């Protein structure tokens, strides 16, 4: 009998349980469109969002709740997402700037920004809100008039964790 109990105890299984652990994470960097941009056609061959040309700059607001954890990356367009048929090349220019801040120290973002190609990066070192505007301009061919129609381009804004 002792041997039977010993043999049976070898086949005994321990009790096991799988216990879930869940959690939710709220975004610590949120991007909102404050104002949509609008191209103006100051001369026949040019579209521009610059107010001096009659355009409207798009404005994006970054709300950051953790200081020094994110980089703002904003890319101005180098093509139209939709437009009439174009038979010649476009020369694109653009820039992104700090427009407004909720904390005085954020004004340093402008001087510290880095630009690579058509992408501007800002090191978001302080918690709070920062507004960025992006200028975009496209000149068609060798000063050819742009065909009539609706032109749309996209500014890409993202928050990159450090």
What residue ranges belong to the model's regions?
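N-terminal small/polar-rich segments of proteins
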Residues: 17-85, 121-162
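N-terminal signal peptide c-region/cleavage motif recognized by signal peptidases
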Residues: 7, 12-16
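Extended, solvent-exposed segments with strong compositional bias
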Residues: 101-124
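Short, surface-exposed beta-strand/strand-loop-strand elements in extracellular ectodomains
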Residues: 87-101
């Amino acid at each position: 009998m002792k041997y039977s109990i010993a043999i049976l105890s070898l086949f005994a299984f321990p009790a096991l349980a799988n216990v879930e652990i869940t959690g939710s994470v709220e975004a610590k960097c949120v991007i909102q469109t404050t104002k949509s941009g609008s191209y103006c056609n100051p001369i026949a061959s040019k579209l521009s969002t610059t107010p001096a040309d009659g355009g409207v700059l798009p404005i994006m607001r970054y709300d950051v709740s953790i200081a020094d954890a994110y980089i703002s990356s904003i890319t101005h367009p180098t093509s139209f997402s939709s437009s009439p048929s174009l038979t010649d090349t476009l020369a694109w220019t653009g820039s992104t700037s700090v427009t407004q801040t909720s904390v005085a120290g954020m004004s340093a973002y402008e001087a510290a920004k880095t630009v690579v190609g058509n992408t501007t990066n800002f090191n978001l070192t302080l918690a709070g809100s920062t507004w960025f505007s992006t200028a975009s301009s496209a000149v068609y061919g060798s000063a050819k008039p742009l065909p009539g129609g609706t032109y749309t381009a996209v500014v890409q804004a993202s928050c990159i964790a450090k």
